[in-house]
């Protein structure tokens, strides 16, 4: 939780709010790592605005969105702080606008994701966009990296949703597609958590497993794009992906799944994931690379090629 628009120490924000990314950041080097931390802190402040952790946060989001829609990057304290990164890396206002759009979607009195297409669109807006922005910060000018970066962000967001079903329900949000859970309301999810063997609770458990299976498709695509990144970025993002994916693996193994204790990764798990990530470096050796699976983006037509051609 940031609680302030002024970002004086992005490294501290990353350390306290993004354990998986903070662990992976150490492999990026000084300049790239610091800029990645700045991008994370920027996105984190936007997220905390959406959650009301920053005073007048939703009002700030509306103001920022109005600036971005007009193609402006400035005239707001948060935007002003990151204008140098926009200039250096050519960050897309359209991509950031889609990120803010997703966070504004969360301002509804009750958030109810309709179906899988709606879910993927939401995940693109709040996480796939971050993948696109990170591509620029990690100094890759290879357009084929972009669709894979989007998919890695989506995979991580699906894991996040699976982990936070109960926490989101307490805030009046249901990100599990209504078509998967008989259009249960957040209140019904809360009630189901009290009786894990009820029909409703078992339906939610099945939906969480289905969500994590869907996430695997996006993680697989994300991994295929790592070889387009500079070598240190390849390794660092590979580590972050494996650490985040580990949360889903633990959820599947957990006896109390979505209604139990919130899943986190231990230091031992992070070390294990780091060792496994070294294997991904072999993908850098020349070999025929599979084209991107475009069916993963069937729902993303309204956002196609934001921030440049997607491969």
Task: State where each predicted segment sits.
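Catalytic cores of Mg2+-dependent Asp-rich isoprenoid enzymes
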Residues: 1-155, 162, 167-311
């Amino acid at each position: 939780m940031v609680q302030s628009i002024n970002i004086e120490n992005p490294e501290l924000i990353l350390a306290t709010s993004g354990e998986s990314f903070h662990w992976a950041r150490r492999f990026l080097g000084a300049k790239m790592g610091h800029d990645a931390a700045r991008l994370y802190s920027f996105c984190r402040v936007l997220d905390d605005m959406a959650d009301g952790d920053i005073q007048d946060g939703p009002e700030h989001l509306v103001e920022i969105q109005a600036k971005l829609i007009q193609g402006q990057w400035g005239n707001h304290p948060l935007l002003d702080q990151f204008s140098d990164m926009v200039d250096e890396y050519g960050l897309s206002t359209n991509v950031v606008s889609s990120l803010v759009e997703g966070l504004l979607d969360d301002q509804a009195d009750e958030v109810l994701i309709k179906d899988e297409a709606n879910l993927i669109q939401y995940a693109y807006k709040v996480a796939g966009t971050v993948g696109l922005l990170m591509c620029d910060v990690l100094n890759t000018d290879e357009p084929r990296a972009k669709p894979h970066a989007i998919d890695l962000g989506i995979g991580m967001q699906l894991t996040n949703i699976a982990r936070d079903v109960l926490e989101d329900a307490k805030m009046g949000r249901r990100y599990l597609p209504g078509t998967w859970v008989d259009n249960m309301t957040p209140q019904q999810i809360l009630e189901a958590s009290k009786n894990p063997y009820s029909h409703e609770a078992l339906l939610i458990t099945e939906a969480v497993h289905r969500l994590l299976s869907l996430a695997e498709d996006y993680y697989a695509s994300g991994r295929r794009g790592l070889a387009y990144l500079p070598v240190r970025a390849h390794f660092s993002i590979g580590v972050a992906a494996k650490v985040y994916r580990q949360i889903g693996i633990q959820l599947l193994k957990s006896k109390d799944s979505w209604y139990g204790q919130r899943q986190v990764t231990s230091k031992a798990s992070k070390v294990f994931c780091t060792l496994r990530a070294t294997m991904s470096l072999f993908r850098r050796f020349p070999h025929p690379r599979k084209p991107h699976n475009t069916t993963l983006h069937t729902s993303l037509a309204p956002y196609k090629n934001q921030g440049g051609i997607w491969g």
